Structure formats: structure tokens, C-alpha cells
Amino acid sequence: MDVGAIEYIHSQLVAQRDEGKAVLLVSLELDEVMEVSDRILVMFEGEIVADLDPKRTTVQELGLYMAGSKREAAQ
């Protein structure tokens, strides 16, 4: 996709999110995930290993969860 199409899709996702609708975004582009998300669930080997607030985490920390190097404490 070209940059214009990506920006359009992002704006539509954010608009839906801001209206209170659930939006599921599956992406390996961590900057994209951080930019458009208000909540991030990370799965590793079929299990949710983290429930993160993108305002309180870093791309590096997100990557560690994705790689299975880090897990949140059981809740």
C-alpha cells in the first residue's frame, strides 16, 4: 500500500476507536500498533502474555513480550 492509503486506513481505525467501537488490528509494525491503539494484547504461543497501555509502554518492551522474553504476572 502507498503512504496515502495507509494514512487513510489509520484515520478510519482511529475514528472508529474514538466512537467507542472495538477495532482489532493485527500487525508486526510496532510503531503502527503504538500509534493507533488504546490497548494492546500480546499473544505468544497461543496465550495472551500481556495487556498493555501504549501510553505506558515502549516499542522495546512490546517487542520483548512478542518474542516471549517477558510475561506479565498472572492476574
Question: Where are the model-predicted features located?
Answer:
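Glycine-rich phosphate-binding loops of nucleotide-dependent enzymes
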Residues: 1-75
